[in-house]
Amino acid sequence: MKIAVLGAGAWGTALAVNAARAAGAGVTRHQVTLWARNAAQVQALQAERANTRYLPGIALPASLLLQGGGEASLGQAVSGQDLIILATPVSAARSMLTQLKHAAVPVAWLSKGFEAAVFAEPASASLAKPFGLMVHEVRAQVAPDLRAGVFSGPSFALEVARGQPTALVAASEHAEVREALVAAFHGASLRVYASDDMVGVEVGGAVKNVMAIAAGLCDGLQLGLNARAALITRGLAEITRLGVALGARAETFTGLSGLGDLVLTATGDLSRNRKVGLLLAQGKTLAEVLESLGHVAEGVYCARTVVQRAASLGVDMPIAQSVVALLDGKLKASEAVALLMEREPKTELDCY
């Protein structure tokens, strides 16, 4: 299979490396092209045969093709491919999907989060609000005929690049897209499950970042394992409520893109979003936290959008609201915890 991975950050590079190495045990070797927008980055990747900025210590397979440097090179990178993987940040999804809208092969994205704003006329009145959109909603606006999907789940890029066992979910309303993702990536170190609930898979992947900030805060304040378990469980309830209100199936959130991704991001030491909470608990300002990270922490940028969309749908999300207040400097860490603990008693499973 010929696969183009567009975006040479940590996750795009990791997936390209994994696919290029895949062979044996019934898995055929793929021809994989990794594309980067920046020509200088491509030159560095070619010279070093490694992505030293995002995945130091991981060698790029000799078979991995490298391209990049602009729209012309993008056209070359996707020409003749069987599958296109969009591994760019959410902020670039609209531009990339617009350029790929006439693609004749399946396109799947790895992005987890929301756009900062609505940049074009919405495809339906339900989207005519000043809220950022998830990538499947952007696709509905700019590339409605594209056979598309989302590839998500509990996964740190470094572990995928190392070939450590990982399970992901390929979600699309098109069976062809699901089958292409399974054929491309299911193998010795990646187990790929299929789903037709794109909305649920995207909501889980996006909103868990906000909950991971809260989990980091919990750990940073040394509130204990009981508190962490409670926060993860109630965070999942909030994610599920929002997802169902947006059209997802509740059971999707018990799977890899819901519970799985939340547990990993809320507890893993490689989680940038969890680190945000840890540093805020130490008394650092948000500006100091972002400067120290060096990479994107999507939870910081999508927290307000999550709360806005929840409010527009009448969905109660107190943990997400507390995270926004904390990021805005309106609450101290200890105050956020106190507010959550002082809420009125409720029935546990009266969620959706």
UniProtKB/Swiss-Prot annotation:
One of its GO terms (molecular function) is NAD binding. Keywords: Cytoplasm, Lipid biosynthesis, Lipid metabolism, NAD, NADP, Nucleotide-binding, Oxidoreductase, Phospholipid biosynthesis, Phospholipid metabolism. Pathway: Membrane lipid metabolism; glycerophospholipid metabolism. Its EC number is 1.1.1.94. The gene is gpsA. InterPro entries: 6-PGluconate_DH-like_C_sf, 6PGD_dom2, G3P_DH_NAD-dep, G3P_DH_NAD-dep_C, G3P_DH_NAD-dep_N, NAD(P)-bd_dom_sf. GO terms for biological process: carbohydrate metabolic process; glycerol-3-phosphate biosynthetic process; glycerol-3-phosphate catabolic process; glycerophospholipid metabolic process; phospholipid biosynthetic process. Sn-glycerol 3-phosphate binds at K112, G153, S155, K208, D261, S271, R272, N273. Catalyzes the reduction of the glycolytic intermediate dihydroxyacetone phosphate (DHAP) to sn-glycerol 3-phosphate (G3P), the key precursor for phospholipid synthesis. It comes from the Bacteria. One of its GO terms (cellular component) is cytosol. NADPH binds at W11, R37, K112, A157, R272, V296, E298. The active site is at K208. Belongs to the NAD-dependent glycerol-3-phosphate dehydrogenase family. It is found in: Cytoplasm. Pfam families: NAD_Gly3P_dh_C, NAD_Gly3P_dh_N. PANTHER family: GLYCEROL-3-PHOSPHATE DEHYDROGENASE (PTHR11728), GLYCEROL-3-PHOSPHATE DEHYDROGENASE [NAD(+)] 2, CHLOROPLASTIC (PTHR11728:SF1). It catalyses: sn-glycerol 3-phosphate + NAD(+) = dihydroxyacetone phosphate + NADH + H(+); sn-glycerol 3-phosphate + NADP(+) = dihydroxyacetone phosphate + NADPH + H(+). It comes from Polaromonas naphthalenivorans (strain CJ2). This is Glycerol-3-phosphate dehydrogenase [NAD(P)+]. It is an enzyme of class 1 (oxidoreductase).
